[in-house]
Each structure stands twice: as C-alpha cells, then as structure tokens.
Amino acid sequence: MNELKNMIKGRLWLPGDAGFDEARTPWNLSVDQPVAAVVEAAGADDVAATVGHAALHGLTVTTQASGHGAVTAEGVILLRTHLMDTVEIADGVARAGAGAKWGQVLSAAGPLGLTGVAGSSPVVSVTGYTLGGGLGWFSRKYGFASASVLAADVVDATGARVRVTAESDPELFWALRGGGGDFAVVTGLEFALSPAPVLYGGRMMWPAERAPEVLAAFREVTAGAPEELTVWFDLLKFPGAPGLVAVDCTYLGEDPGELLRPFDAIGGAIGDTRAVLPVADLGSICAEPTDPTPSAGRVELLTGLDDAVAAALLADPIDPLFNVQVRHLGGALTRPSGGAAGELTEPYLLYMVGPAMPGTAERMDVLSKALVPHTSGRKPYTMLHSGEQAASAFDAGTLARLRDLKRARDPHGVLRANYPVLGTA
C-alpha cells in the first residue's frame, strides 16, 4: 500500500492509523466496514491510480461518497469520493463531481427555474443515487434520475479514464443508467435538468387516530393525481412521543387547487407547512436526518392500495419503526427509462425505517408478510438495503445483460458495488 500512497494526492488510511475507523465509517452508523484500506480521493487521477493499483495487485475497490447505501465491505479498498464535489450548470445541463450532494445541485439549479430528479434527502450523493436509478420527488413527471444522464466520466476496471456517452459506449452507458456501480467508477456525471419554475410542497400532520381518514384521502387523491403532483403517506412514531400520521407532497406549479382538497376536509391537523418553496428547500418537506445515524430499512413495491392493503397498514402500531411510508409512483415511471432501471409498473412503494436495534427487522417482517399478496417482489436498486441482492431489482433479461457486461468489462472483479450484480451483497 505504500506504493499507492506515493501515487495519490489524497489520503490513505490503513488499519491502525489514526483516523482509520472514522474514515471507514459510512453514513449509516449501523454498518461495519472492515476494509483493508481507505483512500480519500482528491480527484479523478487518484481514482485512476487506486483502481489501477488494485487491478495490478489482485485487490478489489468499493466506491462511496456519503455511504448512504453502504453494506458490510470486508477486505476491500474503500474509495471515498466526497471531496470531488464540484457542481456546474450551463444550458440546462448539470455536471456533478462524484462526491456532490443533491442539496448542492438544487441550490444551484433552483434560481434558474430548474431541478434534478432528487430524492427526499439533500445529503445523498448525486452519483450513487443516480447510478441506482434514482427514485425521487419528481419521478412521476420526469422518470428515474438515471434517465436524465447524458454522459459520465469514469475509470474502468483497468484504471483507464474514459468518457462514456450513448454514442461512445452504448452498452456501458445503458448499464450506468440504473444498473449500479459495478462496471466503472464514475468521477463525474452530466445530466439534463428539468423545468421547475415554481414549486409547491410541504407536510400536513394529524394525531395517529386520524390515520384511517388520512389513508382514505390518500387513496382518493392518488387515484387521479396528475404527474405534476406527488403525495406520500406517513405513519410516524418516535421514542417518547405520540404517534402521528402525515402526508408529504410536492406539486410542480404554484397551486394544486382542488387536488389536495380531500386532506383539507379531514380537519384537526396539528401541522401544515404547505407553501410555495424554493427548489433548494426540497429536503425540508420530510426533514430527514442530515447527520449520520444508525438505522435499518426495507422497501416493498405494492401492486395496489385496496381495502386489504389499507387494513394491513393500519392493523397494529408501527413501533419500534420510526416511519411506515407509502409513496405514490406511476406516471413517467411506467414508461421505459432507456437504461437498466427500466420502468416501474407498480403504483405504490412501501418504505419502512427504524432504529438499528432488536425488534426492528421483526416488525418489518410482520408487515412485509401481511402484504405478500399485494407486493410484486421487485425492489428498486436505488432503495436496496443490507442483506438484499441486486437480482431482486431487475427482470431476468436485464439481470443477464448486466451480468454479461460485468464479466466482460471486469473479469477479475476489481470493482465491487454495494449490491453486486454477480452473487450476493
């Protein structure tokens, strides 16, 4: 490793070094990563040097910016790209370094009347999120975030720096748009931004006992919602606090008018933050933690939201989970994305999250099993969690195509995504 240390401008940590444990710790503090070394890349040349060194010496590299999707990574070189966080916007196109976060992109794009297909958190890395497809607030209107990718600057499994477009390498370009990080290390992404001249959004909140009414209104609103409107239903329970039910929404426009009227008719709301807001404030709607936390989560895709599903969701308290959320999908997501992400025909997504403690997995198991007749079995790659496999994110044809590409481009397994397309995570 001393050879690698002399090749890079960034930092290298080895086990026993001061700062090693901090450097190897991902955003999800419940995940342990007993890696062989950590490289903090100062730029694309450091990425190339690290991958080239690994290829030469039979080592494996796992790349993370923030580590939101991290899983246990044993014996690998952990390549940190968080310092590569530049964001540039010109002519409706954003260029984001491998470590750039969505909050940076939205802050730069919003004043121009533009947005990217960002998720609920401003501190998630653009690259990791987009490589996995990227399922966010505006996906009903604009599809997967990966569908907006125009070009990627990458380091391949030999350590060579390459620019990838639909014309230069159509197969790799296809894979990078939703197939994960198994095929190359992305050092920069270029993607088209989408119009958002005015954004309306916020959260409505009620005591937990109003959950049946709120869920009924959610079913009514989402049954006929235009693609500009996205609504999420939340059951919330935090330690030491009473249970709550909430609805989060965004609307690409100034006023959704009657579209949200069924929620207003419920009455008894104890909070309502709905307003026209800057694109840069998108993360304030859900107000998710922006500091590292230990947590466990799971996602299921729902084939519908009929009375049986509603009854299962409301049957029991959600403790010890923090949040049981149902997201409305549909719209542009049902149409082909042009990349490995494909399309999502399921109309709703169930997201469960809780503390990394005994009882959390069991509670998620109970709800997942109750909903088995109403789930498709597929999971979006961008929302896989520890213990799950990439195979569950793709249909058989897409998975076979990704595996063929992996074997052809990285036959020695130099690169390893959090959820590898070959084998298990």
What are these model-predicted stretches?
Residues 1-425:
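Soluble FAD-dependent oxygen oxidases
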